[in-house]
Amino acid sequence: MQDLSAVKAFHALCQHKSLTAAAKALEQPKSTLSRRLAQLEEDLGQSLLMRQGNRLTLTKAGEVFAVYSEQLLELANKSQEALQELNNQVTGELTLVVHPNLIRGWLSQVLDEFMQQHSTLKIRLLSQFQHSDEVFEPDLIIWIEHAAPMGYRKERLGYWRYATYASPKYLAHRDKPTHPRELIHHPWIDFIACRRAELELHHPEFGSYSLPALESRLQSDNLAMQADAIAKGRGIGLLPTWFANGFETAHPGSLIPCVNGWQSQPTEINCFYPLGRHPLRLRLFIDALRQARPDEWQ
């Protein structure tokens, strides 16, 4: 059986194609990696890597062993997780991909509390993701709408409903609109996520109204910027009701709902996790997300 630290060194060299980069990734001296690779090659009786210019490439034997090194490391990780679960220990790393508009406020608080409860857990949080990226496989994706990526199960966390808002400063000099048809007479701050040829708004008593696409000097896909522009009195725009209520709580007197009762169709907030059995850290984090869902998302 090969030394696991030597297998890790070989795997890092395969990934980075450079002794310097692999040593940096493992936070180990280059001399240590060289020594472990030499010992592994001696144990196997085969040369695994060769240098071509400034890069390391696999030999034929290296290509064969690279497949098994992946399996050895995966098995080692699974065995470690199984032993830790006996004592309900949460360790390792979670890689999360989260929509930028979900991070501030809600998720940052969930993450902080979860990491306080599990002091040895590491979190890697990203806000950009391409479904076509077959190499990168995050543990969990939290996104607004979207179909489930291949190999992932979808779970709905809740809904956002958008409504129109203005600031008291803006309405101090203009009449407050009472029906969506009046919005065409006001400067419009366009939230790109809701931009359509037309936007369907609904009222529990008055039915539906199709709001045409309106000209806008400012278009943004960032909720914080959208709310700031509205609060500064630049015009009227859409915000999720949950986000607007939180913004108003943090900044009292900054936002006023317009055309009361009219809202967009619900927009799904989903999380996606891999099929199959999950490590304890992921199962507990998914439970934490479920428990932390705001009531306004229902």
From Swiss-Prot:
Entries under InterPro entries matching the protein: LysR_subst-bd, Tscrpt_reg_HTH_LysR, WH-like_DNA-bd_sf, WH_DNA-bd_sf
Domain of life according to the entry: Bacteria
Keyword DNA-binding: yes
Entry keywords, A to Z: Activator, DNA-binding, Transcription, Transcription regulation, Virulence
Gene Ontology biological process: DNA-templated transcription
Ranges where the HTH lysR-type domain occurs: 1-59
GO molecular function: DNA-binding transcription factor activity; sequence-specific DNA binding
Residue range(s) of DNA binding per entry: 19-38
Annotated family: Belongs to the LysR transcriptional regulatory family.
Function: Transcription activation of the irgA gene. In the presence of sufficient iron, transcription of both irgA and irgB is negatively regulated by a fur-like protein. In low iron conditions, negative regulation of transcription is removed, and production of IrgB leads to positive transcriptional activation of irgA.
Protein name: Iron-regulated virulence regulatory protein IrgB
Species of the source: Vibrio cholerae serotype O1 (strain ATCC 39541 / Classical Ogawa 395 / O395)
